Amino acid sequence: MAVRGINKVILVGRLGKDPEVRYIPNGGAVANLQVATSETWRDKQTGKMREQTEWHRVVLFGKLAEVAGEYLRKGAQVYIEGQLRTRSWEDNGITRYVTEILVKTTGTMQMLGRAAGAQTQPEEGQQFSAQPQPEPQSEAGTKKGGAKTKGRGRKVAQPEPQLQPPEGDDYGFSDDIPF
């Protein structure tokens, strides 16, 4: 089977606001996140530090959306794996576009740290994935070839089977204002 391309996005950033969770007609949860990523560098001409922040719209589905709504808050640091998608719609005769990172059944969301004032966050480094994960190895896990390793046990949420996101570009709801 020939591979025609890979569409995978990995982000590590902070939430700009609390997640917005909605439920679509089939009962599945959809969460919208605004994730900021920043890079800093020293300006060669002035010698001053510069920073550029990019904002990313992330859409989570199913159990991941519910977990995000329950545990994530503004300022929380997250690791996201998903796919890049651009969708379009008509607004008063004008075609509008939005590019989003979709975290579906093959995606991952991991909480990396605690936001200031967060009280209901689970353990730091808690990972939630839309696909079943293998059980973590014990302290004396083995690598391929029999070499012993010391593993850090990590709690991994075992999600229930996921609902597929609805077909089409509207994800089961209509957004008049995309941002």
From Swiss-Prot:
Q: Which residues bind DNA?
A: 55-61
Extract the Gene3D superfamilies matched here.
Nucleic acid-binding proteins
Keywords, ordered alphabetically: DNA replication, DNA-binding, Plasmid
Q: Which InterPro entries match?
A: NA-bd_OB-fold, Primosome_PriB/ssb, ssDNA-bd
Q: Where in the numbering of this chain does the SSB domain appear?
A: 6-110
Q: Where is this region: Disordered?
A: 114-179
UniProt biased composition (Acidic residues): 167-179
Q: Where is the composition biased (Polar residues)?
A: 118-132
Gene Ontology CC terms, in alphabetical order: nucleoid
- What's the stated role of this polypeptide? May contribute to the conjugative processing of DNA. It has a functional relationship with Psi (plasmid-mediated sos inhibition) proteins.
Protein's name in the database: Plasmid-derived single-stranded DNA-binding protein
- Organism whose genome encodes this protein: Escherichia coli
